[in-house]
UniProtKB/Swiss-Prot annotation:
Protein name: Large ribosomal subunit protein eL15
UniProt similarity note: Belongs to the eukaryotic ribosomal protein eL15 family.
Gene it is expressed from: rpl15e
GO molecular function terms listed in the Swiss-Prot or TrEMBL record: RNA binding; structural constituent of ribosome
NCBIfam families given in the database record: PRK04243.1
Record organism: Archaeoglobus fulgidus (strain ATCC 49558 / DSM 4304 / JCM 9628 / NBRC 100126 / VC-16)
Length: 194
């Protein structure tokens, strides 16, 4: 017999079909009108949130972040050059959008630490992620055996230690083809320059 979470997971495998698709259509209309970073009372994808460490207890909050898709936009230079050299639209960041969303959530709530995040929707212009944040100084977190380690860390997301950050840094790979990702890309670049 399947658990409730198995049914939720199955429904979210095709988020634009069936009843989840209908919900998504209404949700996206509402989310577009909201601010870029919004605290929400409970996770949209309960199965995913719980798998990533969410618990319905004091000291843990969920924030939905809207982020614009595509590469970074730069301010248009006002001095002369070839139009090819403007580089307004073709600035590809070395971070994935999920990592950027986590950083923005943490900037809004600086007293908290990013535990993890997951995708909840996208359209032609935006992507939405839900970020799980933990209050590192809350007594309920300090006394929780699974989450007490968070109270001993600071600025995980800015150091690329979340799952999305580790992925962008190439740390999902090991062995052949991943020689240059450890200890870090910067360390290997500096070593090469010596």
């Amino acid at each position: 017999m399947k658990s409730m979470y198995a049914y939720i997971r199955e429904a979210w495998k095709r988020p634009y079909e069936g009843y989840v698709g209908e919900l998504m259509w209404h949700r996206l209309q509402k989310w577009r009108r909201e601010p870029a970073v919004v605290r929400i009372p409970r996770p949209t994808r309960l199965d995913r949130a719980r798998a990533l460490g969410y618990k319905a207890k004091k000291g843990i909050i969920v924030v939905r972040v809207r982020i614009r898709r595509g590469g970074r936009r730069a301010t248009r230079p006002n001095k002369g050059r070839k139009s090819k050299g403007l580089m307004v639209n073709r600035r590809t960041p070395k971070k994935n959008l999920q990592w950027i969303a986590e950083e923005r959530a943490n900037r809004k709530y600086p007293n908290m630490e990013v535990l993890n995040s997951y995708w909840v929707g996208e359209d032609g212009r935006y992507k939405w992620f839900e970020v799980i944040l933990v209050d590192r100084d809350h007594p309920a977190i300090k006394s929780d055996p699974q989450l007490s380690w968070v109270s001993r860390t600071r600025g995980r997301v800015y150091r690329g230690l979340t799952s999305a950050g580790r992925k962008a840094r190439g740390l999902r790979r090991k062995g052949r083809g991943a020689e240059k990702v450890r200890p870090s890309l910067r360390a290997n670049f500096r070593k090469k320059r010596r």
